[in-house]
């Protein structure tokens, strides 16, 4: 029985026998005769004769039908005659074809004449793709074998015994197939018809020489059943075993291969993977024929070159976009993949009732789903670095891997594949479908499963394992649906992203790679089947995602509905894991499934489990956020430790190398502008060298529409304070300086500072502290009978001297010692002054125009004037009208109306009405809008008198009869006393304190790292310019200016470009700031041109300016931590907010700190209200050593860090708070 087979049980007819001759006569030297005999044997006519003489099969005759059990018995029988494929392969040196000779051409021509007989009508000849047939190539190979006998063979290098090796390619296809004939073509579709297999041989048989030649070739490669079978050669890239191999198509998995013998494995490979002519499954495009011409000597060169130049895998982590698709039924009860959730950083779910996206939130996962996910990845298929570029190709390999890993049955192959290729729908499809929605029509199942041929676009190793056409109709997806094969399938090509959301696409980073999660219940599976896929490179799978983002990861989970697995929660779990930064970095760098399991364990270490108890109120979850922050901190520390250990080892982990380099470059390029050099004017020189080289770009960067919008916005933001402070300054100085002088000063100094300053984004202007100093100095000059404007000239000259000395000594570093303790006292004091001045002015209006039961006629106004003169301060010039009816009430209405409108628009900015940009525009123009509305109200009431703003006509001083544009330094009306020329150094030092604090703190706020200014700043240069220009202002009688904190921060925010690729729910991030000088020049120029609007400015009532003053004072208080702690004194401890100064400091010690600040404010208020009001800047400066020397003796460092820390970062959210709440500085 060695040459036959044992019949299977049941008395069935035996399988066809394969006869192999054991003894053959020796070979002769005549090669030509051998070729002739071989040509007669392989002639096409012989195939026709063999087929025609085969007895016909009678379908009515009863015969045995073989089951799978019979074939299994046949495969495992020890008597199965077997010829290994490796015995049929030509030696490696035969791959190099010798150049054709004349003798070979003659033999080929003679062979062609002999085999040109027409075949029989039974079976037409079947030729392979890529030429006129395979016969010529087989003939050439046999001729080469004959010629090689006479050629010397190079001896192989000594080494271990050669094992049996298998390969799929041109070599195997050109060699003779395995001579086995199966009884049923449907069960074994890979059976081929061979001339030597027929049980009835007709015609001339091959000569003994030809058969001996073949046998000698087999004997030269002895085969032993005990030869080892190298499983690594049967692995394909992306297989569950994780090892890349040269083969793309494998007959079985590793577990089955270990249980079978080498003969069975070889036979399975022949049946499943060989392309046997005669029983055609699909055309195999041979790489040798595609790449090079037939008979080309360099046919294999491109393949070898391509293998050598294999692309390096990209393991660099990218940004992530995750989409969860679930298998659902539509209205017509047809299955399709429906998007139910997505992740960019936080989870967004589709609301079932409204089909719209919900708000982003932190994903909450069940602990059981995480454990099931870990078990699924451990037991399921893991295909890493899969080299496929289409969804059908990926689906084919996923299904085959599921079959190999025994997750699904082979008969479920078609159903699972159809399920994976179903169409995908998204919530935005119906909205963006247009007039002609595209519904990709599905082809028949056979076309999808059988006609998907590998194309060169798939790459050299991108061949997809296909299924035979003759395996029968695939099972329907749903048993109740007879038309399941007409279900729409996912087909590549066409415009598949018609429903994409451009707004969502803007929020996804440019280099993001997507993860697709497919989960669902199917009725035809008996157990859940899962696969985790990582592609070798990201590919764009059309019609799969909502937006056109290349896909890198896929997770598939299918199973029956009767199991306890919650597929939705399991899909949410893997999607949340992939959106986690550390896990998706580990997924990029994973080499096998153990790395993925380790990453899941790391994720579980940083997760929180909440007990299953009812939570009533958010206050009960306060500890969760703090505990989570602590876990994240420990997690970052572990990652940092790993990076440090990796770096010490001399190499950097993939993905970490770039961050380390970037961090190092940032550290080296960072330049501290406040660092002292130790040389005279060293800081000034560094500022010039740092900032002026960017001067050309400061002009080019202004060519953008955003700069135009910023100019218009900041113009109104700068004009409103100029008018408000100008009107109040005219009141305080009795008209010596007013709106005209302040507008001119703002314009001139603004243009010069924008052109020469180191930080041109600063907006110079008048401020509340300078207004308080001007009032104090005016009262001092009136008390000493000195000329106010002449005294300001000498104060300005001394100011220049002190500024030069401070800049030469690099004194700008002192701004580091000004902590929020001093800033809050400063801002709180100025806010109180604004509020007090507002109601004080309103009181004066009610005094001048009281509410009387009977108002005298116009001729009796002089009597009323005499009666009320004692209550009014002495003034020069003609007095205004008195005792006007309804003036006080209308002034009150105008003041409160201006305040309420501006305050309401500020609150409206942070509301939920309209869009974010519209709210921000309305809120930013709140002050100009409130002024305009109240001016129109006053203009519409013509029978009531209100005091208006004093503005001259044209470019003129406020009081031409009192002063001119140039102020004589030696006095105008009388000589200025010499002692005052020297004593002016004291007020100059005081005004320097105010200018230094406001300018340097404002520059420090603008230069925060969070604002990402790239061109740098210059504290020394800016201070020198503002101080020197202050001396120029004294000579021309113009007010001193400083860097206005609120206006400067508003200017920077208006020029800030925010990143659009921000995950929903994440805080906004700055992309860049348009640092340039043109906007500052234009803003100052427009403010200067506003002097021609004198007729319009004269229509503004002073009561409207009082309302703006009240608005500035109230809004400044709302952003100061001191005011918040002041309210906590009257609040029970259980209602205190979760702030560091509350949770880390005892309540009574927190109140003690607040009381110390209130004591300093009270002392400054007392000094400001007395004759020594000029010295209040000096007392303000004393709060710095108080904080540095005294408070550390009363409080611990931990408490001071919580009470007096500058940890506030700029808020760029369109729904966030405005600049007043972010700053601790006065307006």
Curated annotation (Swiss-Prot):
Name recorded for this polypeptide: Anion exchange protein 3
Name of the gene this protein is made from: Slc4a3
Comp. bias (Acidic residues): 134-152
GO molecular function terms noted in the UniProt entry: active monoatomic ion transmembrane transporter activity; chloride:bicarbonate antiporter activity
Tissue specificity comment: Expressed in the brain.
Cytoplasmic side: 1-707, 906-920
Region (Disordered): 1-256, 286-312, 428-497
Location of Phosphoserine modifications: 167, 170, 175, 198
Pfam families for the chain: Band_3_cyto (PF07565), HCO3_cotransp (PF00955)
Source organism per UniProt: Mus musculus
């Amino acid at each position: 029985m060695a040459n036959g087979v044992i019949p299977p049980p049941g008395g069935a007819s035996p399988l066809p026998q394969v006869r192999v001759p054991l003894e053959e006569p020796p070979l002769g030297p005549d090669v030509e005769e051998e070729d002739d005999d071989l040509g007669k044997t392989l002639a096409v006519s012989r195939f026709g004769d063999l087929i025609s003489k085969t007895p016909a099969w009678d379908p009515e005759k009863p015969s045995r039908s073989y089951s799978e059990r019979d074939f299994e018995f046949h495969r495992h029988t020890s008597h199965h005659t077997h010829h290994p494929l490796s015995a049929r392969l030509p030696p490696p040196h035969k791959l190099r074809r010798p150049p054709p000779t004349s003798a070979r051409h003659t033999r080929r021509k003679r062979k062609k004449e002999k085999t040109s007989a027409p075949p029989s009508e039974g079976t037409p000849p079947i030729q392979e793709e890529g030429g006129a047939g395979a016969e010529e190539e087989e003939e050439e190979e046999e001729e080469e074998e004959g010629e090689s006998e006479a050629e010397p063979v190079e001896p192989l290098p000594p080494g271990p015994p050669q094992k049996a090796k298998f390969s799929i390619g041109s070599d195997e296809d050109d060699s003779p197939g395995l001579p086995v004939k199966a009884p049923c073509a449907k069960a074994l579709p890979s059976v081929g018809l061979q001339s030597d297999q027929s049980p009835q041989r007709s015609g001339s048989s091959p000569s003994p020489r030809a058969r001996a030649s073949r046998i000698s070739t087999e004997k030269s490669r002895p085969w032993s059943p005990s030869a080892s079978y190298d499983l690594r050669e049967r692995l394909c890239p992306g297989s569950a075993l994780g090892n890349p191999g040269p083969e793309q198509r494998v007959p079985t998995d590793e577990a089955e291969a270990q249980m079978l013998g080498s003969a069975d494995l070889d036979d399975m490979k022949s049946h499943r993977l060989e392309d046997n002519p005669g029983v055609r499954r699909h055309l195999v495009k041979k790489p040798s024929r595609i790449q090079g011409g037939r008979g080309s000597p360099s046919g294999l060169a491109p393949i070898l070159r391509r293998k050598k130049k294999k692309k390096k895998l990209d393991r660099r982590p990218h940004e992530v976009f995750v989409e969860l698709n679930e298998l659902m039924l539509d209205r017509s009860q047809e299955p399709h993949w429906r998007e139910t959730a997505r992740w960019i950083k936080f989870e967004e779910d589709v609301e079932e009732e409204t089909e719209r996206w919900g708000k982003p939130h932190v994903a909450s996962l069940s602990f059981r789903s995480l454990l099931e996910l870990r078990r699924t990845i451990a037991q399921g298929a893991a295909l890493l670095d899969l080299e496929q570029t289409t969804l059908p190709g990926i689906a084919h390999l996923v299904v085959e891997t599921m079959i190999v890993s025994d997750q699904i049955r082979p008969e479920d192959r078609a159903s699972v594949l159809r399920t994976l290729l179903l169409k995908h729908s998204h919530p935005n499809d119906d909205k963006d479908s247009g007039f002609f929605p595209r519904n990709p029509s599905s082809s028949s199942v056979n076309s999808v499963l059988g006609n998907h041929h590998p194309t060169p676009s798939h790459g050299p190793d991108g061949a997809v394992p296909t299924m035979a056409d003759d395996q029968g109709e695939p099972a329907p997806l749903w048993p109740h649906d007879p038309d399941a094969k007409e279900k729409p399938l996912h087909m590549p090509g066409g415009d598949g992203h018609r429903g994409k959301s451009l707004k969502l696409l803007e929020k996804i980073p440019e280099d993001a790679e997507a993860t697709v999660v497919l989960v669902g219940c199917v009725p035809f599976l008996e157990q859940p089947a899962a696969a985790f896929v990582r592609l070798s490179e990201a590919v764009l799978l059309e019609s799969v995602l909502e937006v056109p983002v290349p896909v890198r990861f896929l997770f598939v989970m299918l199973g029956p509905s009767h199991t306890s697995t919650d597929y939705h929660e399991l899909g949410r779990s893997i999607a949340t894991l992939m959106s986690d930064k550390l896990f998706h970095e580990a997924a990029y760098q994973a080499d096998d499934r153990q790395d993925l399991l380790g990453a899941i364990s790391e994720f579980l270490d940083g997760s929180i489990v909440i007990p299953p108890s009812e939570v009533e109120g958010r206050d009960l979850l306060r500890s969760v956020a703090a505990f989570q922050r602590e876990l994240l901190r420990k997690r970052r520390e572990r990652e940092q430790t790993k990076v440090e250990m990796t770096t010490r080892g001399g190499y950097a982990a993939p993905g970490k190398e770039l961050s380390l380099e970037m961090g190092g470059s940032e550290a080296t390029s960072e330049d501290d502008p406040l660092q002292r050099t130790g040389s005279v004017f060293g800081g000034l020189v560094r500022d010039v060298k740092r900032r002026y080289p960017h001067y050309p770009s400061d002009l080019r960067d202004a060519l953008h529409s955003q700069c135009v919008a910023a100019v218009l916005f900041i113009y109104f933001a700068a004009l409103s304070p100029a008018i408000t402070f100008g009107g109040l300054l005219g009141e305080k100085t009795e008209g010596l300086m007013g709106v005209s002088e302040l507008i001119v000063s703002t314009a001139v100094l603004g243009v010069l500072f924008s052109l020469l300053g180191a930080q041109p984004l600063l907006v110079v202007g008048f401020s509340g502290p300078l207004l308080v100093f001007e009032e104090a100095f005016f009262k001092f000059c009136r008390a000493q009978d000195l000329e106010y404007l002449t005294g300001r000239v000498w104060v300005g000259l001394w100011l220049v001297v002190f500024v030069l000395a401070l800049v030469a000594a690099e004194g700008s570093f002192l701004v580091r010692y000004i902590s929020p303790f001093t800033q809050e006292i400063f801002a709180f004091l100025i806010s109180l002054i604004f509020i007090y001045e507002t109601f004080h002015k309103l009181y004066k209006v009610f005094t001048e125009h009281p509410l009387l039961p009977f108002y005298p006629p116009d001729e009796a106004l002089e009597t009323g004037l005499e009666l009320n003169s004692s209550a009014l301060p002495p003034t020069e010039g003609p007095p205004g009208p008195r005792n006007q009816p309804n003036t006080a009430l209308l002034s009150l209405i105008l003041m409160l109306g201006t305040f309420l409108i501006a305050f309401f628009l500020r609150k409206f900015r942070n509301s939920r009405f309209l869009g974010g940009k519209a709210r921000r525009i309305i809120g930013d123009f709140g002050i100009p809008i409130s002024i305009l509305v109240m001016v129109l109200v006053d203009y519409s009431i013509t029978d009531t008198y209100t005091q208006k703003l004093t503005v001259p006509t044209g470019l003129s001083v406020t009081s031409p009869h009192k002063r001119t544009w140039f102020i004589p330094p030696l006095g105008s009306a009388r000589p200025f006393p010499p002692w005052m020329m020297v004593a002016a150094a004291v007020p100059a030092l005081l005004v320097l304190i105010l200018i230094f604090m406001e300018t340097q703190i404002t520059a420090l706020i603008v230069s925060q790292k969070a604002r990402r200014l790239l061109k740098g700043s210059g504290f020394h240069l800016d201070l020198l310019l503002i101080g020197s220009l202050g001396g120029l202002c004294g000579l021309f009688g113009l007010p001193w200016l400083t860097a206005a904190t609120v206006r400067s921060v508003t200017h920077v925010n208006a020029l800030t470009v925010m990143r659009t690729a921000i995950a929903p729910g994440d805080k906004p991030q700055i992309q860049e700031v348009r640092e340039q000088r043109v906007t500052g020049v234009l803003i100052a120029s427009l403010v200067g041109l506003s002097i021609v609007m004198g007729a319009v400015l004269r229509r503004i009532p002073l009561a409207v300016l009082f309302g703006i003053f009240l608005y500035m004072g109230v809004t400044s208080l709302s952003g100061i931590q001191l005011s918040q702690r002041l309210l906590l004194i009257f609040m029970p401890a259980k209602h205190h907010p979760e702030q560091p100064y509350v949770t880390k400091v005892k309540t009574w010690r927190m109140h003690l700190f607040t009381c110390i600040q209130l004591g300093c404010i009270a002392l400054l208020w007392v000094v400001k209200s007395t004759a020594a009001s000029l010295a209040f800047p000096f007392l303000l400066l004393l709060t710095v050593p108080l904080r540095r020397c005294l408070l550390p003796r009363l409080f611990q460092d931990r408490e001071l860090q919580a009470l007096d820390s500058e940890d506030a970062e700029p808020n760029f959210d369109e729904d966030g708070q405005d600049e007043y709440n972010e700053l601790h500085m006065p307006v």
